[in-house]
Amino acid sequence: MLKFIDLFAGIGGMRLGFEQAMHELGIETACVLSSEIDKHAQTTYAMNFHEQSQGDITQIQDFPSFDFLLAGFPCQPFSYAGKQKGFGDTRGTLFFEIERILKAYRPKGFLLENVRGLTTHDKGRTFKTILQKLHELNYGVYLILNSSNFQVPQNRLRVYIVGLDQSQPELTITSHIGATDSHKFKQLSNQASLFDTNKIMLVRDILEDHPLDKYNCSTDFVNKLLAFIGHPIKLNGKRLIDYRNGNSIHSWELGIKGECTSDEIQFMNALIANRRKKHFGAHQDGKKLTIEQIKTFFEHDDLDSIMQSLITKGYLQEVNGRFNPVAGNMSFEVFKFLDPDSVSITLVSSDAHKIGVVHQNRIRRITPRECARLQGFPDSFQFHPKDSLAYRQFGNSVSVPVVKAVILDLFKSADLASCF
């Protein structure tokens, strides 16, 4: 019997992947403690595992005996924690809770999961401190994996840190990293999944056939989209956002805040196409430009009236004589339409509910069940009855098949199955 604890458990994605791996290896398991501070996530966890998670990990002092630790912990800067000791002190952070538990209970192994940004967070000091602390405990090795390589049609890069007591695991698993910008990721047709080499999963594989009408985009929004783009299939892969050019649709092209003339549309498109050029400044998302700078790439006899009209409609803003788009994607019902023949952008908790798809002649948002499938959750998994919470929870979760694959690799490479 292998006993494990599930910390920062969320809705149980790591536990699910771990238990699937153990079942495949023929190892009986028991979760002896789970901890999750969010009460709504606790509800979903209880619905699926029929156990009530304990709350705040910092308030749990005594743990039952266990062999393995699972944790998807939040990312926090260590250089600001424990000011008395300065850099390298992990006190006051949630990783410290993992550190104290590992030190006190010395489990056989662990799996930690975090965002890819952990490796560069606080100029790399956060990750360096984590690895240093684990090394001091004689634990730890890490890898970066993309969910799209594990029978999950989602571009999701995550850091997985695994450890064995008094041993350095030698993992064989690897992953194609893909594009840094999730919107630019395109799965290669010859790129086999490391989880199932016989099939590459695409968005179309996870779509529901008859989702409820409540997931349809509004008639007004659909009409605006079709008036601009023509055939619905042209929406595949399109991004709806006002501060980027490229394969994007903009609010002024749809008339979201008010219909625009062709001259006004041309002006706004020229502005976002040129404002990021280096000779205007090195700002990542573009610099506010003066009228003189704007005239270097857009000439029109009625330029002043065009710009004033756009300011009045809410597409353009002026700050101290400089101009910039009123940027963002919050004005759209959907900010990205998935390409059914590719993989999804990364699900995140804040806007998983605003991802769209064109399927069976319907222009709609993806459903909570489709979000679950993008994370590799089985259809037997029950999601929260409130859609807004279900979207957020799946955006916060882990990709179940990746956890399963990492655990299988760890146990097979270290011959751990014989220990339980």
Curated annotation (Swiss-Prot):
The keyword tRNA-binding does not apply. Residues 2-417 form the SAM-dependent MTase C5-type domain. GO terms for biological process: DNA restriction-modification system; methylation. The active site is at 75. Disulfide bonds: none annotated. InterPro entries: C5-MTase (IPR050750), C5_DNA_meth_AS (IPR018117), C5_MeTfrase (IPR001525), C5_meth_CS (IPR031303), SAM-dependent_MTases_sf (IPR029063). Pfam families: DNA_methylase (PF00145). Keywords: DNA-binding, Methyltransferase, Restriction system, S-adenosyl-L-methionine, Transferase. Its EC number is 2.1.1.37. GO terms for molecular function: DNA (cytosine-5-)-methyltransferase activity; DNA binding. Belongs to the class I-like SAM-binding methyltransferase superfamily. C5-methyltransferase family. The keyword Membrane does not apply. This is Type II methyltransferase M.HgiCI. NCBIfam families: dcm (TIGR00675). It catalyses: a 2'-deoxycytidine in DNA + S-adenosyl-L-methionine = a 5-methyl-2'-deoxycytidine in DNA + S-adenosyl-L-homocysteine + H(+).
